[in-house]
Amino acid sequence: YIKDRNAWETEYIIRHSYKYLYLSNESNKLAGKEAVGTEIESEMWRFGFGRLSGYGYKLGESAAIIPYYSYTLNWSNIDFKKSTAESVNPNEEILNLYDETFRFGTSSEGGVRIKIIDNLMFDAGYERSIVFQRHLFWKWAGSAIIEATAQGLLDGFISEVFESTPAAGPIVNFLLKNALAYGIYELRQDKMNWPFSSEAPIAYDQFKFGVTFVF
């Protein structure tokens, strides 16, 4: 579901919101790479739902460029494929906990969406995602509330920027939202439910490019 509207009483800034369900497949094979030595190939099926939002600059009647921040909740099934080399991976025991089972996780993404016409958009982004060993609901909820509160505090500051300098608002929103998300995910590299005591998750970082058709 996509919604665009003019923002902050200007004719050149829009508020872009995109809520979605998705199913994806990610694999080393898509990049034409094979595991060497202790390296491990993986193939991951993932589904979930998310929300993408941002403020953008109108370039015409329908065209716009939109720096965005996105957050998803998802479930992943990862199939780890070991190298044929006779070598032992020190993380093999941990990886076996995830192998070919569905696990809960979250991700955040920052990028730029270029809207050509109402029905066609191009995306380029950088995503950080984590897959939990176990879903400890109360610890996860506490960590999520801390992140949501921090994002809410940023919204107040960003609103002040828009009121004083609307043209700078979309860039400030993009930088601050994604900087906070990046920092939170760094803290979760060792504790998946930071700041609460919990195991380290599996983490994926990747660049993404895509095309979105709107019907």
State what each model feature region is.
Residues 65-67, 106, 120:
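Hydrophobic core residues within well-ordered beta-strands of beta-rich domains
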Residues 58-62, 115-119:
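Outer-membrane beta-barrel channels and translocator barrels
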Residues 117-215:
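Predominantly the C-terminal beta-signal and adjacent terminal strand-loop region
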Residues 1-4, 45-57, 71-73, 108-114, ...:
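Residues on the lipid-exposed face of transmembrane beta-strands in outer-membrane beta-barrel proteins
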Residues 16-23, 67-71, 122-124:
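Membrane-embedded beta-strand positions of outer-membrane beta-barrel proteins
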Residues 23-46, 76-105, 135-144, 182-202, ...:
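Extracellular/periplasm-exposed beta-strand and loop segments of Gram-negative cell-envelope proteins
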Residues 1-16, 27-32:
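Start-of-domain marker
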